Amino acid sequence: MAGTLIISLDFELFWGMLDVCPLEKYQDHVLGGRKAIPELLALFQKYGIHATWATVGFLFARSAQEAASFFPEEALRPTYDDPALNSYAEFSKIGETDAPCFFAPSLIDLVAGTPGQEIGSHTFSHYYCKEKGQTAAQFAADMAAAKAIAAKHGHTLTSAVLPRNQCDPAYIRVLRDLGFTAYRGMEDNWVENKVHVHFPLRVLRLTDTYFPITGYGSYTPKQEDGIWNLRGTQMFRPIFKPLKFMEGLKVHRIKRQMLHAAKNGLTFHLWWHPHN
């Protein structure tokens, strides 16, 4: 039995960084990600690579007004204990010149028009399933909105990636009930399967990028409660400048993981963000 390579990209622009840093500090990364997408698509076409682009629902909109027309009713929007996580509140702050960091309908069309590329979901609002204060009902409303705005633009969503890989069984059942057939589950190792990450764990994650402290990570996919868990194996992390001289080790590690999956008929799931 041949091994399987899965590639997924978290297509989110600035929506995934709202609680991390101000736009002006990250804008160049986001705009660089926009420029990288056509180049990635050209490479994918050249080498016959199929990929799933897990897309934040807000990106389908051509304006804040269009996005707002798909908002769930107020009671069904996320009530996070930490208000910085609530991307619905961000729309009043988006200026005309900021739009390329928040909306991307033309890029979605470009991806969808490229052979072998699937438009998946990264939730409507970059929703956090394990943060305190929100509920499964609010998540269901958010995902229904994601499906609705995608459908308006001609896309049927069947694959999902939950932001920051915050997977919860009750929320996965919501995905199944909404017609999703697969999701990217959390990596099955002691370094990655944590929701909140402290500094020592970040160091271990970085180390695992270059050295196999968590092993190969390949697996046989399983269908659980009627939906396929295609869990991640390795994030293709961006270049860390102080360790740039070790990039060869990072690539070598990924190649070894891919080879192990190929030789043993297993699945290897590589993922990243376009702005990486």
PLM regions and their residue ranges:
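Short, intrinsically disordered, charge-balanced linker/junction segments flanking boundaries
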Residues: P274-N276
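Catalytic alpha-helical scaffold of carbohydrate-active enzymes acting on polysaccharides/glycoconjugates
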Residues: M1-S159, R164-L230, M246-W272
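Positively charged, amphipathic and often flexible ligand-engagement surfaces
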Residues: T233-F236
